[in-house]
Amino acid sequence: MLDYHTHTTHSWDGMSSMDEMCQSAIVKGVSEICFTEHLAVREGDPCYGWLDMDAYGKDIAKCRNKFKDKLIIKKGLEIGEPHLSMNKIEPYKSGHDIDFIIGSVHNLEEEDLTVYMQGKEQIESYTGYFRELLASVSQGDMDVIGHFDLLKRYAFDVNGRYRHSDYEELIHEILKTAISRNIGLEINTSGFRSSSLEIFPSQIILKMYKELGGEILTVGSDSHSANMIGNNIPPVYLMLKQLGFKSVFSYTQRKPSAVDI
């Protein structure tokens, strides 16, 4: 089992140390873990200025040495809005032996998604979100799209479940652009912890992705504490098999490798 979305105390909202996360991963049967610490370069974002790349690198080296016979450890980043301020992001990537980058949209119009959607109808909120995601995928440097339809985490209680058909053209454009740039999709199991009670992205989007020829998938728990490592990943593997996918992907130095499921 691979968990490719995790946060330690190197992220502003992480609650467990890297050592604690590794120990939990081993107990839960995770064979490979990728730490994807938050990176934001926009002042006002709660992540801004938090990540110390030198300290992060030292912790990775320490845990790789300590758990080398029990756990494969990869070094990643989750970059918020990677298409913005790309010159500011570059120093965090260059010279730091990054294995994997998740590109996510956490903010829109310089507002947190929970603030952005206030007072908006569902169609306006989701259209704005998917347009920003398209810009991110078109311009940003990433290996996978993080939690593709994340907005539903915040919008579900306000606007209910969204209809994919209302945004089908935009979603298709995002997926086609991702495939053309060799960018994969992350399946994020934290959706099971939200009111929507479904993964990010939904199965409908995964089916679209497969029909368009997409293959690259990673699966992550979005753990922010040790007790959440690996949560709901085995049933997602089963679902992927049922959808016709045969592999998930591992990354080393930004290069993907298929791993049978």
PLM feature segments, named:
Residues 1-3, 32-34, 72-76, 99-102, ...:
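Structural preference for beta-strand elements that scaffold enzyme active sites
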Residues 1-83, 92-97, 154, 159-165, ...:
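An N-terminally biased module of ancient metal coordination in phosphate/nucleic-acid-related enzymes
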Residues 5, 25, 37, 101, ...:
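Conserved, mostly hydrophobic/aromatic
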Residues 38, 148, 214-230, 250-253:
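Short acidic/histidine-rich active-site segments
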Residues 47-181:
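Extended substrate/RNA-proximal surfaces in nucleic-acid metabolism proteins
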Residues 95-100, 140-141, 204-217, 234-249:
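Structural recognition of alpha->loop->beta junctions
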Residues 175-223:
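Glycine/small-residue-rich hydrophobic helix-like segments
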